A protein has these predicted regions:
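Substrate-binding cleft/loops of secretory-pathway carbohydrate-active enzymes
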Residues: 134, 204-233, 271-292, 335-344
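Sec-dependent N-terminal signal peptides
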Residues: 3-13
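Aromatic/acidic polysaccharide-binding cleft in carbohydrate-active enzymes
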Residues: 273-375
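Glycoside hydrolase catalytic-domain groove-lining segments
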Residues: 237-295, 315
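Short, flexible/disordered intra-domain loops and linkers
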Residues: 50-56, 88-92, 128-130, 170-173, ...
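Substrate-binding cleft and catalytic face of glycoside hydrolase catalytic domains
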Residues: 68-240
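Mature N-terminal, pre-catalytic/accessory segment of carbohydrate-active enzymes
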Residues: 15-62, 66, 71-74
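Extracytoplasmic/secreted proteins, especially bacterial periplasmic and envelope-associated proteins
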Residues: 59, 63, 98-102, 134-141, ...
Length: 375
């Protein structure tokens, strides 16, 4: 009986020992000097969802300001289409400013670093493989106007063409075409005496594996003078992050960045692309189909769940530990973008500011993952 008792105690001890996790903190090692910060994508809103134009009330702007003050973002990405403020080839920079200014005013008043840019804005013609110099010049003049004439010194970085490595991009994945556009645009910034005030960002590549790291490598080789900040976009699967594989993937891009330069995550979110996450993807599609205003093609319906917050925190910690200097989450507000139709929103946000006015009062409430990202 005594032997049995001893074995029983040893068994309990071994189970307890096996379950212990040792966490060590190295307070002396610096992972990243001069961290830019974390924040969110905050673009000018679509406003027309198929039944006439809506306007964001001052009360709703205040509501967003108050929520952002709780979050305390340090880094905001703002993307526009320069051609939306052009007519017959002429730039009208004041057009739409009453809307854009609310976003930039917040960032300027809170000392938030802004990555401004152009989604594509017919800056290139992939079929003819030519750059559109007139539009590129207009983009350079537009950002000069915002910085010099309107005083938005919070704009520190410029992102020309979203995800140029993708077949969905206006560049159709053609590196040489995009590189020519970057060189020309940088020359226009120099003409406008902005080269010392505004840094160009790139390659802005969307990645799921380490296979696209050559974009950073070739970028660092051919455009080292033009580029002031490196960035990529990641939409990993849940299993990729939870397993820790995500760190290995994004580290490949950090290692391709020249010494002394920084790289940030220009967009980050989750997509259930791996077979191991197929159950989540089926549920994601089921939820999107059940919600009248959700895009079936481009929505993350788990933003309503606490799980999404813990997963995003996991991804952020791995990104920081891999040596990145900031992360911009996709995205702040559902009401910014639609996909298949004007009322089929990309549901990815912390909320939908037009919930009470149009999409359902409950949609305007803050979702759980906002708090995880705010920590």
């Amino acid at each position: 009986m005594k032997i049995f008792y001893i074995l029983f105690i040893l068994g309990l001890w071994s189970c307890t020992a096996a379950s212990q996790t040792v966490v060590s903190v190295d307070a002396k090692q610096i992972i990243n000097e001069g961290y830019i910060g974390n924040g969110a994508q905050w673009d000018p809103y679509q406003l027309d969802y198929g039944k006439g134009r809506l306007n964001i009330s001052e009360a709703d702007w205040k509501k967003m300001y108050d929520r952002l003050d709780f979050m305390r973002p340090q880094f905001i990405r703002v993307m526009t289409n320069t051609t939306s403020v052009m007519q017959d080839g002429v730039l009208y920079p004041e057009r739409g400013l009453e809307h854009l200014s609310h976003i930039l005013d917040y960032c300027q008043s809170r000392d938030v670093t802004v990555m401004f840019g152009d989604w594509r804005g017919v800056m290139v013609d992939a079929r003819k493989e030519v750059i559109r110099e007139k539009n590129l010049s207009a983009a350079a003049e537009y950002v000069r106007f915002l910085i010099e004439e309107k005083g938005y010194s919070c704009i520190k970085y410029y992102n020309l063409v979203n995800e140029p490595n993708g077949y969905w991009s206006s560049t159709d994945g053609k590196y040489s075409l995009w590189a020519r556009a970057i060189r020309f645009f940088y020359g226009e910034l120099q003409k406008n005496k902005l080269a010392g005030k505004l840094s160009v960002v790139g390659p802005d590549a969307a990645i799921w594996t380490a296979d696209e790291a050559w974009w950073v490598d070739i970028f660092a080789t051919h455009l080292k003078d033009e580029i002031g900040l490196y960035d990529i976009h990641t939409y990993p699967s849940k299993i990729t992050v939870n397993s820790g594989e995500y760190t290995d993937i994004i580290r490949a891009y950090k290692q391709a960045v020249p010494a002394g330069r920084k790289i940030v995550m220009g967009e980050i979110g989750f997509k259930f692309v791996e077979p191991a996450d197929s159950v989540y993807q089926r549920e994601n599609l089921r939820r999107a189909a059940a919600k009248p205003y959700a895009s079936m093609d481009d929505s993350q319906m788990f933003v309503y769940d606490f799980m999404y917050g813990t997963d995003m925190a996991d991804a952020l910690f791995q990104t920081v530990n891999a040596g990145y200097s900031g992360s911009v989450v996709w995205m702040l507000d559902d009401a910014m973008h639609a996909k298949e139709a004007p009322d089929k929103l990309k549901v990815w946000g912390f909320w939908n500011i037009f919930g009470e006015e149009y999409f359902g009062t409950e949609e305007e409430e803050v979702r759980p993952w906002f708090y995880a990202w705010s920590l």
